[in-house]
Amino acid sequence: MTSTTSKVTFGKSIGFRKELNRRVNAYLEAENISPRDNPPMYLKTAIILAWVVSAWTFVVFGPDVLWMKLLGCIVLGFGVSAVGFNISHDGNHGGYSKYQWVNYLSGLTHDAIGVSSYLWKFRHNVLHHTYTNILGHDVEIHGDELVRMSPSMEYRWYHRYQHWFIWFVYPFIPYYWSIADVQTMLFKRQYHDHEIPSPTWVDIATLLAFKAFGVAVFLIIPIAVGYSPLEAVIGASIVYMTHGLVACVVFMLAHVIEPAEFLDPDNLHIDDEWAIAQVKTTVDFAPNNPIINWYVGGLNYQTVHHLFPHICHIHYPKIAPILAEVCEEFGVNYAVHQTFFGALAANYSWLKKMSINPETKAIEQLTV
């Protein structure tokens, strides 16, 4: 997939990316490590899929005890996010396997959890990874103007409260994804000024088939085995609201956070070479937390991921020190929050900063 031609260009290489690639390749060769097709990733995939299937089975067919059902739905919601973070993400980036059919099947798990892999690969792989934190190009920081993530975004009165209400918006995002996917693929066919490559009938059929799959798994089957329609809707809502909260928080901690930079969308040329711009617009978090490392599929090493999306995420903890060395040598700040809650606080701080009307702030500065 390719994007429409963009006027945004990046600076000439100063050797940063070349040197980083050289050292990472040297590490992989010295340790005889394959960047993809790794047995630990296969095992992880099996564990996550077993988690999701067993949680769903427990919720639908398990003991008829309310608190167990509710807990099971939450556990299933965390499992759905784990599928997206690990299996779907690596597959759709081509980082799961050297075999494209394996990546394709892994990527289809995105469709299975409610997100079109076809649209995701364009929106995320092309637009987000190329134009990270550039408003008007990076769809993932746009937020449909409900939340002001970038200083370049027009301020609206309700942004004043965004650092409070955003936590109540996250759980509903999966519903938005499901509806927006259909609207975008069938009718809209573009993100901002970027035209989406025309989907084939197979792409459209895949989209609709998996939307139907979601309805069957979370509504039709539960109702068929004896749950009321209301009970089925409540259960599905708990699952997907849990998934939405978890997925959105993890994304925000990578880019919508201090000290990540937001590049000026009116500047058609970025002075930095692309790889350096990626480092400046991205932040890692909780690198020494083994639970987070395993669960979020390396997305806490988001900077490493943006530079090496084609490498399986299980290698990111070893690549991160190499990146840190190269950044230090080239005078590039490699931002890392050491804890999850430290990153969460930095994200909240940024959202609060963006909640201030820039015109009011400018007037206050003039009167000082």
UniProtKB/Swiss-Prot annotation:
Q: Which InterPro entries match?
A: FA_desaturase_dom, Fatty_acid_desaturase
The consequence of H315R is:
Loss of delta-6 desaturase activity
Q: What is the effect of changing W294G?
A: Loss of delta-6 desaturase activity
What positions does the record give for the motif labelled Histidine box-1? Answer: 89-93
For the motif Histidine box-2, give the residue ranges. Answer: 124-129
Induction summary: Expression increases approximately threefold after lowering the growth temperature from 35 to 22 degrees Celsius.
Q: Write down any Gene Ontology CC term.
A: plasma membrane-derived thylakoid membrane
Q: Which domain of life is it from?
A: Bacteria
Q: Where are the transmembrane segments?
A: 47-67, 68-88, 164-184, 204-224, 233-253
Q: Keywords on this record?
A: Cell inner membrane, Cell membrane, Fatty acid biosynthesis, Fatty acid metabolism, Iron, Lipid biosynthesis, Lipid metabolism, Membrane, Oxidoreductase, Thylakoid, Transmembrane, Transmembrane helix
What name appears for this protein in its UniProt entry? sn-1 linoleoyl-lipid 6-desaturase
Q: Which gene encodes it?
A: desD
